[in-house]
Design a protein with these regions (language model features):
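Extended, intrinsically disordered, low-complexity segments
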Residues: 224, 279, 283-317
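Hydrophobic faces of well-ordered beta-strands that scaffold small-molecule active sites
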Residues: 17-21, 44-48, 100-104, 128-130, ...
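Glycine/Thr-rich beta-alpha phosphate-binding loop at enzyme active sites
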Residues: 71-72, 134-148, 179-240
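Glycine-rich beta-to-alpha transition loops that act as phosphate-gripper elements at the mouths
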Residues: 103-106, 169-175, 224, 240-252
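Catalytic cores of alpha/beta
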Residues: 29-35, 112-122, 173-186, 236-238, ...
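Glycine-rich phosphate-binding active-site loops on the catalytic face of alpha/beta enzymes
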Residues: 48-53, 128-134, 190-200, 247-248, ...
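N-terminal capping/small domains of soluble enzymes
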Residues: 1-100, 106
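C-terminal helical cap(s) of enzyme catalytic domains, especially alpha/beta-barrels
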Residues: 59-68, 202-216, 258, 270-295
């Protein structure tokens, strides 16, 4: 019998399948499906959509463009801001039957510190994800594209909380392992990747940009090969757990990410096509592991790396 249970940064999870931030609206899903959602929640942990210090309206429409193998989004992180999240969303998310990971993004170290301080305090929050894809207003640099900026940010927020800090990495860099290593040096407990790839779409009639913001981020099956490559590179570069994501739509594809060194996998774009994707991927992953003779996800972890899994399996999750 294959046991899917994993320990992630000291948080026990029933299985390694979680959601990508902003791809599954648990509050809306509960309104639609009622308490049945709580009885059969599709993920072992829930990652909130990214919140910012102040409310954001998001980008102008149009915001989505479907591609033959995925989609380009330019949502722009619309959210209620920190106070609105704590007052209105957190009480509802706190009722979910799984650990809650809250994603935050600031424009400066001071904003990140305020967000971490506010989000880490409530007992409902198990861990925080730092979205480092926004330009720093002080340096003009995108934090997650610069190892030194990433390390500096982690050093600034690490003393604020003992709860796990996960750094969400951008794929739009030449050496993701260097950024991940800097995050680890700064005190990160885990990293997650990949975020979306920079992309654009043109209106076939006008030959002008279709998206209201001009460009956006590509996700879905089109990015899966890139994601696996970067997960492997990062898993080989750090000793902290890796959450792998990017175009996962089946258990076999989830297993590829585990073999690439991921401790957890996240389902993202597939949730828009199939709201029950998390549960299905989990079932299929269990069967894939059983069929191949693995007794747990850990037994498959890192098998594709140059020195298979022995190093990864010895690491604490």
């Amino acid at each position: 019998m294959t046991n899917l249970a994993v320990d992630f940064c000291g948080i026990p999870l029933e299985h390694p399948v979680i959601n990508g931030s902003g791809t599954f609206d648990a509050i809306a899903a509960r309104r639609a499906f009622g308490d049945e959602l709580l009885r059969s929640f599709p993920f072992s942990a829930f990652v909130s959509k990214t919140i910012t210090l102040e409310p954001r309206a998001g980008n102008p429409p149009p915001r989505l463009w479907e591609t033959p193998a995925g989609m380009i989004n330019s949502i722009g992180l619309p959210n209620k801001g920190l106070d609105g999240f704590l007052e209105r969303d957190l009480p509802l998310l706190g009722e979910l039957p799984v650990p809650l990971i809250v994603s935050v993004m600031g424009r400066s170290q001071d904003e990140f510190k305020a967000l971490v301080r506010g989000v880490a305090a409530p007992p409902e929050v198990a861990a925080l994800e730092l979205n480092v894809s926004c330009p720093n207003v002080e340096s003009g640099l995108i934090v997650g594209e610069q190892p030194a900026e990433t390390r500096s940010l982690l050093e600034a927020v690490r003393p604020i909380t003992e709860k796990p800090l996960i750094v969400k990495l951008t794929p739009n860099v030449a050496e993701p392992g260097a950024v991940a290593g800097a995050a680890e040096e700064g005190g990160a407990d885990a990293v997650s990747l990949i975020n979306t790839l920079k992309a654009a779409a043109l209106d076939p009639a006008s030959l002008r940009p279709w998206l209201g913001a001009g460009s956006g981020g590509l996700s879905g099956p089109a990015v899966r090969a890139v994601a696996i490559h970067q997960v492997r590179a990062v898993a080989a570069a750090v000793s902290i757990p890796v959450i792998g994501m990017g175009g996962i739509g089946s258990g076999a594809e989830a297993l590829d990410f585990l073999a690439g060194g991921a401790a957890l996998v996240a389902v993202g774009t597939e949730n828009f096509r199939d709201p029950a994707a998390g549960s299905r991927v989990c079932r299929e992953l269990r069967e894939e592991l059983r069929r191949r003779g693995f007794g747990s996800p850990a037994e498959a972890r890192g098998l594709s790396l140059p020195e298979p899994a022995l190093n990864l399996r010895s690491r604490s999750s």
